[in-house]
């Protein structure tokens, strides 16, 4: 009886399992299509003894799976520990160098030879530069004597005396009306950016025309010929002659006041300018330098001596006549 009851229970369980399998087939698809005849063989009735025997196998399988999972976890932990140890080792390998000097123990043979070669190269360069500097010293001394010329010839210096150019043409030869663009006429433009020294467009045009007129009229040859013509006409020496006459007249009046004798000799006249010399100092003769004897002084003194002797003779004659 017990055996029958057990068989009945097993049959019910199998029916329930088959119903569950049908539901899974409907929802997720059948596994028999992939398995084929193997799946059909699994659906056969399993005796109770075999069913009881298979349960421990599943437990063992689960236990094996759990063991595998534990092994994997242990392996992961070991790998993490190894990585941590590697990081610590790499951190410990870092070296902090405080000194700035070169460590000869870490330099190769090529690096050790470079300082000596550099020293030899610098010594050779100094030996080559030394005679050049000695030879260039006199040249520098000569150039220091003429500092003005050196400043004028300085490279890149701005020549303020040179006339500015626009497209290769001096600005004094350019008519602003000819230019296509006149930026100084735009509203808000600053004239000082285009015209210096307070010029405007109108005053600059007047300045250009005046300069052009002066350049055309200026002729040194013409001016010299005009002076020569005035000299030949005697107009350049009139002022000097007139001044000499006035001085001589003033000298005679002065002598008349001093002496009652009207026959007294007059003062020597100043030397007249020779022909061809323009009057200087307003027609007056130039002042003689210290220690310089003015011209015609000897002749004037001779005339004065003879005149004095004559005056003395006439005065003595007059005295005799009175007696």
Curated annotation (Swiss-Prot):
GO molecular-function term, one example from the UniProt record: RNA binding
Name of one Pfam family that matches: Fip1
Key words, A-Z: mRNA processing, Nucleus
**Could you name the domain of life of the organism this protein comes from?**
Eukaryota
Mark out the compositionally biased spans (Low complexity). Answer: 294-323
Name the residue ranges with Basic and acidic residues bias. 56-65
Task: Give the span(s) annotated as Disordered.
Answer: 1-94, 292-323
What main location does UniProt list? nucleus
Signal peptide limits: none
Biased-composition ranges, Acidic residues, are 19-34, 66-94
Where does it live in the cell? Nucleus
Task: Name the chain's protein.
Answer: Pre-mRNA polyadenylation factor FIP1
């Amino acid at each position: 009886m017990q055996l029958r009851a057990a068989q009945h229970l097993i049959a019910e369980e199998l029916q329930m399992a088959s119903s569950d399998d049908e539901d899974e087939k409907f929802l997720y698809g059948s596994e028999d299509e992939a398995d084929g005849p193997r799946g059909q063989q699994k659906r056969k009735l399993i005796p109770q003894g075999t069913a009881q025997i298979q349960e421990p196998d599943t437990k063992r399988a689960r236990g094996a799976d759990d063991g595998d999972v534990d092994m994997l976890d242990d392996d992961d932990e070991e790998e993490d520990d190894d990585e941590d140890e590697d990081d610590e080792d790499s951190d410990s390998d870092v070296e902090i160098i405080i000194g700035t000097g070169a460590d000869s123990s870490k330099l190769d043979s090529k690096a050790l030879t470079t300082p000596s070669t550099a020293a030899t190269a610098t010594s050779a360069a100094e030996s080559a530069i030394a005679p050049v500097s000695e030879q260039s010293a006199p040249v520098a001394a000569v150039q220091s004597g003429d500092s003005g010329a050196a400043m004028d010839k300085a490279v890149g210096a701005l020549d303020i005396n040179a006339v500015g150019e626009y497209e290769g043409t001096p600005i004094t030869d350019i008519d602003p009306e000819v230019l296509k663009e006149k930026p100084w006429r735009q509203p808000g433009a600053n004239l000082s950016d285009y015209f210096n020294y307070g010029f405007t467009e109108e005053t600059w045009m007047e300045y250009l025309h005046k300069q052009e007129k002066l350049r055309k009229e200026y002729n040194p040859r013409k001016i010299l010929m005009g002076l020569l013509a005035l000299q030949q006409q005697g107009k350049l020496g009139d002022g000097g002659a007139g001044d000499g006459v006035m001085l001589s007249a003033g000298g005679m009046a002065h002598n008349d006041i001093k002496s009652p004798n009207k026959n007294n000799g007059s003062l020597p006249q100043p030397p007249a300018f020779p022909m061809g010399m323009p009057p200087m100092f307003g027609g007056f003769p130039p002042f003689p330098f210290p220690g310089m004897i003015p011209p015609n002084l000897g002749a004037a003194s001779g005339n004065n001596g003879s005149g004095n002797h004559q005056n003395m003779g006439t005065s003595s004659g007059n005295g005799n006549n009175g007696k």
